């Protein structure tokens, strides 16, 4: 005979343990973010391990920016100026926007905020890196960033990924790295 009372207790206990783990994770990641300069230098291995285990959604945007040092970029100040310029890639970017995460609520509606900010970031990048310009596949990276952070921050992280982490090699017109 099954004791339904004990299964309720164990379920409740498991739920309580999970919420404590989540709370501990929030406290830990909050401390990491607040003490980033010290933590980055003194506990690099532990940070790598924690990142591999997963960054809580609430901290993802700031941690991704910290990990790639995007906040130190002067390019962020140029972003609004880049948006005022014309890119030779604009027509191509507009054509492809609807193909980027077409089922995701943020991007699926024509001329939605999601499509607008995706266009903005892709256009700005095409002006910063004229050799790469625009490549449709890169919009999926930017789209993922935009799901986590505002467009200026997404732009800075994308520039860092492309330049410092050599993703731009994958998107050069020759695509030699593929």
Question: Where do the protein language model's features map onto the residues?
Answer:
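Solvent-exposed, flexible loop/coil residues
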Residues: 101, 110, 136-138, 174-175
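Structured all-alpha helical bundle cores of eukaryotic regulatory proteins
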Residues: 80, 85, 128, 139-178
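Hydrophobic (often cysteine-bearing) scaffold residues that line and stabilize catalytic clefts
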Residues: 114, 118, 138, 154
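N-terminal transition regions in large eukaryotic proteins
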Residues: 1-126, 146, 168
């Amino acid at each position: 005979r099954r004791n339904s009372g004990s299964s309720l207790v164990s379920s409740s206990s498991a739920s309580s343990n999970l919420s404590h783990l989540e709370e501990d994770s929030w406290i830990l990641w909050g401390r990491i973010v607040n003490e980033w300069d010290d933590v980055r230098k003194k506990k690099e291995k532990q940070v790598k391990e924690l990142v591999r285990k997963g960054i809580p959604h609430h901290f993802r945007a700031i941690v991704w920016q910290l990990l790639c040092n995007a906040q130190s970029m002067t390019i962020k100040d140029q972003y609004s100026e880049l948006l005022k310029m014309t890119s030779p890639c604009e027509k191509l970017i507009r054509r492809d926007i609807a193909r980027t995460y077409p089922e995701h609520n943020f991007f699926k509606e024509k001329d939605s905020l999601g499509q607008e900010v995706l266009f903005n970031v892709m256009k700005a990048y095409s002006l910063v890196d004229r050799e790469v310009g625009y490549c449709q596949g890169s919009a999926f990276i930017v789209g993922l960033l935009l799901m986590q952070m505002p467009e200026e921050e997404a732009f800075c992280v994308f520039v860092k990924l492309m330049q410092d982490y050599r993703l731009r090699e994958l998107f050069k017109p020759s695509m030699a790295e593929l």
